[in-house]
Amino acid sequence: MLKSTDVRLIINNRIKSFTGIAQDRIQWTNQPNFKIPLEGLWCRVTIQYSDSQSAGFFTETLERDYGIISIQCFARKGTGDAALIALAQAWRDHFHHYRNGDFEVTMTNAPTEAMDDVQGDFVMSLVRVEFRVN
C-alpha cells in the first residue's frame, strides 16, 4: 500500500522526466527562490488530494486515495498562444494512462484554452491530471 510520501516521489519523478520544458522553468509547490522567467514559457505544478475511500477489508482496511495534479502553463501576454497550447498538450500526453505500481492516472483533461492569469501579466493554459492510489 502506497503512502503519500511514496506517491509524491512517483509524481515528482514523472515530472522530472518531462522534456517539453527545461526543469528550471517548472515551479514546484512551496519551492524557494523560484524566479519567473522574463521571456518564454513556464509552468507551475500543484498536487491536491481529494476524498479517500475504503476499498476493501483484508487483514486491515485498504484506503484508496484520489487526487489531481494541476499543471498551469504560462506565457506573457502578447506573445501568442500556439506554443503555450502545444506545451499543455505535451504535459497531457506525458501523463496520459501513466501507471506505476499502485499509482494510476485515471484521466487527463484536455488543456484549457489560454486565459488571463490573475496577475494580469500572463495567459495560462491548465492541464488537470486525475489520479488514484491503491
Where are these regions (language model features)?
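Oligomerization/assembly interface segments of phage tail-like spikes and tubes
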Residues: 62-77, 123-134
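Mid-chain, well-packed structural core segment of small domains
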Residues: 70-90
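Acidic-leaning, charged glycine-interspersed low-complexity segments
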Residues: 22, 89-134
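Short, solvent-exposed beta-strand/turn "edge" segments of beta-rich domains on protein surfaces
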Residues: 57-64, 117-120
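Small/polar-rich, solvent-exposed N-terminal microdomains that initiate assembly or binding
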Residues: 1-61, 79, 90, 98
